[in-house]
Amino acid sequence: MKKLLLATVASAAMATAVSADDVKIGVFLGFTGPIESLVAQMGPGAEAAIAEVSASGSFMNGSTVTAIRADTTCVDAGAATAAAERLITSDKVSGIVGGDCSGVTTATLTNVAMPNGMVMISPSATSPALSTIEDNGLFFRTAPSDARQGVVMSDIIMERGYNSVALTYTNNDYGKGLADAFAAAFEAAGGEVTINASHEDGKADYSAEVGALAAAGGEILVVAGYLDQGGKGIIQASLDTGAFDTFVLPDGMVGDSLPEAIGTDLDGSFGQAPGTDSEGAATLVSIAGDSFDATSPFAAESY
């Protein structure tokens, strides 16, 4: 798979760069929206790799490589597809790093990338549905599917001695896919999901959603959402009302901005995100220096 991915990227670049001195790669992530604090590290991660390739002088007989940013917004499929169209038709990119969130990635792949024969490599679109989507050999990702994360999250919760959880998820492809994978794994292991309810991002008040979650009960609350919008709102409303005081945080909820916003009330909560403690990860931290946080979720996958 790794060799196929690299060959595909190289072929895409060659298609437009045989006689050119500069190859453009789109960095197509949610620079605004519900995971913008994560993308603040992911974008520079992707750009560091592009700059490294360009500086090597070894790509395409010395051709340079330039990163072109475009905003997926994470949640607005219309805005994302328009941005991807601009990358392809106006900026003339040869490949795309992205998208980030699963819904906009699916929409862009189907409506823009496939009709234009454009390669997309996502660092963070984790919906299980993307594993089997018809992609004409154009879509790859460097993060594992939520089919796996759901099992891992179930195992972690069980190991900590919890057997009953309430579950809320952001109402999109990412949230629904992760919630379904987790609920299936947790119930198969003998756990109880008291409620499996969606929430919308961008609301000012989540008291109704939290009221329903509290009424269903559960020892802890699993929040399969986004740390900069709905997920944060659910947690704050839960704390304000006393509905829950311990939260399980999957990858879309892991980042510095959440504890900065909530503070010590998050003490005791836990979660997980894909990553590695490999030698390569340590090397990336050195490469990043002070320019970005290479340990942030999906920064390494973006690189």
Where are each of the predicted segments found?
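Hydrophobic alpha-helical segments within soluble ligand-binding/sensing domains
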Residues: A80, T142-A166, G177, A204-S207, ...
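Extracellular/periplasmic periplasmic-binding protein-like sensory domains
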Residues: I235-Y303
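Extracytoplasmic ligand/sensor domains, especially the bilobed periplasmic-binding protein
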Residues: T89-A197, T246-G271
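Immediate post-signal peptide segment of exported/extracytoplasmic ligand-binding proteins
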Residues: V18-V27, S58-T66, I157-N163
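Short, solvent-exposed loop/beta-turn-alpha elements that line the ligand-binding surface or hinge
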Residues: G57-N61, T132-D135, E279, D293
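Beta-alpha junction/loop-to-helix N-cap segments that form part of ligand/metal-binding clefts
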Residues: S37-P44, S56-L130, T142, H199-Y206, ...
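Gram-negative bacterial Sec-dependent N-terminal signal peptides
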Residues: M1-A20
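Extracytoplasmic "Venus flytrap"
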Residues: G26-E47, A70-A77, D100, T168-K176, ...
